[in-house]
Amino acid sequence: MHVYIVRHTSVVLDGNETCYGDMDIDVRPTFEEEASITRAALEGLSFDGVFSSPLQRARKLADFCGYGFATLDDRLKEMNFGDWEGQPWAEIIKDEPVDQFFARYIEGVPPGGESLMMQYARVRDFFLEKRREGYKQILVFCHGGVINCARTITGEVRLVDAFASLPGFGSVTRLDFTHLED
């Protein structure tokens, strides 16, 4: 199964200043300009399935690119940072052991949230299910963390290294799940 996986365009919050994952935040005023580049990158491609995170930043891009009919799936949401969602990183660092969390981020769970391993498991479940259902080429609108989990599943990166480089906003990544084992 071949997958074209699209990261949403930039959002109104700065992820270097504010913690956001599965928080449903809006896109920036530059959305149409950014989304036009993504739409052009998808021109001429065909898919036997189109899926999207239900978060508005992914749904809006799917709609703009002509895929407003995409099937929404919660497994495609960004990592849930729980009580940290929407909080300034400066505050989290003051009140929470953030350095400890990032030192053990694969298994570490933010208060009320999920670990990277939990996110990885749900993302893997999604892609394995789609492959079992017989899809040959799908399009997915989602988030940087989901894309990095998918890259880990296909063996492109190790999970421990997955967040060293997030794909750019509005980028399209092509992955091959053909030889993936259940």
Where are these regions (language model features)?
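Active-site signature of alpha/beta-hydrolase-fold catalytic machinery across serine-
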Residues: F64, C149-I153
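Short, hydrophobic/glycine-enriched beta-strand segments
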Residues: H2-H8, V140-F141
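Short beta-strand scaffold positions
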Residues: S52-S53, A121, F141-C142
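GST superfamily/GST-like fold recognition
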Residues: G144-N148, S171-T173
